[in-house]
Amino acid sequence: MTQYTPMIQQYLKVKADYQDAFLFFRLGDFYEMFFEDAVKAAHELEITLTSRDGGSSDRIPMCGVPHHAAKNYIEQLVEKGYKVAVCEQVEDPKTAKGVVRREVVQLITPGTMMEGRTIDEKENNFLAALTHFEDGSYALACNDLTTGQNTVTLLTGSVEDILLEVYATGSKEIVVDSSFSKDELNKLTETLKMTISYEDATAIPEGLEHLVKNVSQAKLIKAIGRLFNYVIRTQKRSLDHLQPVEIYYTNQFMKIDVHSKRNLELTETLRTKEKTGSLLWLLDKTKTAMGGRMLKQWMERPLIQKEKVEERLEMVETFVNDYFLREDLKEKLKEVYDLERLAGKVAFGNVNARDLLQLRRSLLQVPAILEAISLLDNAYAARLIQGADPCESLTELLGRSIQENPPLSIKDGDIIKDGYNDKLDQYRYVSKNGKTWIAELEKRERDITGVKSLKIGYNRIFGYYIEVTKANLAALPEGRYERKQTLANAERFITDELKEKETLILEAEEKIVQLEYDLFTALREEVKVFIPKLQHLAKVISELDVLQSFATVSEEEQFVKPVLTTKREIFIKDGRHPVVEKVLNGKLYVPNDCIMPEKMDVFLITGPNMSGKSTYMRQLALVTVMSQIGCFVPATEAVLPVFDQIFTRIGAADDLISGQSTFMVEMLEAKNAIANASERSLILFDEIGRGTSTYDGMALAQAIIEHIHDQIGAKTLFSTHYHELTVLEESLDQLKNVHVSAIEENGKVVFLHKIQDGAADKSYGIHVAQLAELPDSLIARAKEVLAQLEGQEEIIIPKRVEVKVQEQEVIPEPVVVKEEPVEVLEAKVETEEESQLSFFGGEQSSKKQDKLALNQKETAVLAQIKKIDLLDMTPLEAMNELYRLQKKLKKG
């Protein structure tokens, strides 16, 4: 290092402590980066890479950004998952002896960003800390530095279960200790796409003990300690806004795994990963940013305590029934800014005068809000606002201290109102009267000299001056002025009197700016005292905002208040999928009932593709979620139990575990439901078993249905294309067949989207293929094959038998179900095979099958089709292969 210049040596010494971060090294008006940081930053930020002499034989790579634009560049890096260490000059270069002293003042990371475009106003920005214990358990602590919120929970179960809970927090960064295994770290980085940070200290930092008074469990304290130590080490500033730690237990809320949340599109859509089109999008009528964040938190964790849900529902009903109260509340909420994040900025020291003005405007609305709610005859409302302080003294303080239109910077003056500070008023008087004197002096000198163009000006280098054009110099009295500066077309002068006033004016203006800054920082410290009260107010207002949002959307969309029952029964009359109905935008939506008495556990749903089976299933899940977060539901009448968990397998879900086939993911999700569901759970399985052969799929589907029916007893909607399974209604007394109806008109299928009792009579798969505009020749061939397959006389369905756990496997005895044969074309297959395998039977039929005559080329094409593995092909690849084979047949 001795070969480098002192400044580069200083850089390398600081960089050694921040190897995993970009080091923004302050040099005058720029933040500079050197060596590998410079090369990488130039690429990521698309800025010019240069070099400089650093004392060694080779020039050092270098790039930099202006200090006034650094915020934007830092946000870009953090958005990409990087960390940025900000190293400032901490002494005046004019008084420094040798190299200016520099220190890192903040480490900015994805989990500690306080503001900027990466921070969504209606989403939390949680930093997570995960601690692993020898008994296999984990403690998960989370902190949102922007709001001061802290939570902690103890987790048990598989590593995948732990990862799913971590994923549910939405954290972009996770803090672990150095003992975490490489496999664990890979799952966090590759599976959850999180930035990894390390912290081994677990003792609660001095000064933060009061935040964990309600936490006694050693494991939880370790996780919180790790989190707090990391925050203190990286932020290096006041954390007065941190709130007491809230302990939560996952069994206090309805469990919805990540796959199910995605399938149901609770907070984002499957296709675009955006809020628009999700349930959150529909329900979010909140007027405040903090209300929007609370709404999302409620949706992530629906309640399972019936009494708490009913309290929310009653409050929503109050708002629904009182239009004027609700509208008045909404108007006031529009004027309330983000109290939580404003409090965080006050504590952090980066609050400006405009922020404090927003705080005052928000507080002005609070007394009326609290008074209106206090008049309600509602125990929940009374308890909600209990202890809420409107902070009227703070409102008064801000009202008499902050100007109405202050600048963004707190170092340019013009922040503090007249009358707030006597000394400031005196300086302003001197400055104002001094400038008045200057104007009077200018008029007087014009009169004395007779030069009408004479003017008095000011610049920072020369101060105040009298300027006269060269054409008028002869008119000036001899010896009246002292020459100060010569310009091309004018001369500038000074007088003793003007010098004296200049000193007074400039001193006053300089003192004004400094005094205003001092007064503002003192004011900020006074506001800090109110942070706990502001945070309590924020929670009250957020909750009221969410409840009015529920009431607003419930009235607009004609939702109904659900009745919660302790019985295991579902009664939904004219239920609708709330988002689909909204997206249809006034077009006719077909409502459907879902009536499952206490002794009815399984609906086996059949019907054609595109008929609405999946929508019906999602509809029930969304109604359940809406009910248990305290919102009215899309129906004309609804009686619902309180579910403890929702399990879904609907559509193609992403594989968080990574690298698994679609069928494997399907089986893992089925296993998750079977292993964890209770009779208080809701299970939605769509087409289980489709990812394997017909026989395997049908066998698995039947076994899963029987297990849920006999062993779990959970309310279950199970859709299937295996129409043969509908005979299970005869042997499973708590299973009922329902179907989505369709009719044929003029050779075309019309989907009615109506759920009716009984099994579907047809699949209409070929009609769907026609709608997709597959070639006519292919459709015709499919109809021929279908007719042949439907001609099979016998369908083998395994008889249901009792199978005890850990006993020898029992092979079910086949049951023969007779069907009427369908007339087919008489033809002879001219191939080497003498008979065709039965599609439904387990063996070849003894009865000789009718065959369709095929030529040699057609036989070869069929052989190729048999070899195609459709599960390993994309839809586009499948269509291309189909086109190739069709082209080959046409040539023949």
Swiss-Prot record:
InterPro entries: DNA_mismatch_repair_MutS, DNA_mismatch_repair_MutS-lik_N, DNA_mismatch_repair_MutS/MSH, DNA_mismatch_repair_MutS_C, DNA_mismatch_repair_MutS_clamp, DNA_mismatch_repair_MutS_core, DNA_mismatch_repair_MutS_N, DNA_mismatch_repair_MutS_sf. One of its GO terms (cellular component) is cytosol. Keywords: ATP-binding, DNA damage, DNA repair, DNA-binding, Nucleotide-binding. It comes from the Bacteria. GO terms for biological process: mismatch repair. The keyword DNA damage applies. GO terms for molecular function: ATP binding; ATP-dependent DNA damage sensor activity; damaged DNA binding; mismatched DNA binding. Gene3D superfamilies: 1.10.1420.10, DNA repair protein MutS, domain I, MutS, connector domain, P-loop containing nucleotide triphosphate hydrolases. This protein is involved in the repair of mismatches in DNA. It is possible that it carries out the mismatch recognition step. This protein has a weak ATPase activity. NCBIfam families: mutS1, PRK05399.1. Belongs to the DNA mismatch repair MutS family. This is DNA mismatch repair protein MutS. The gene is mutS.
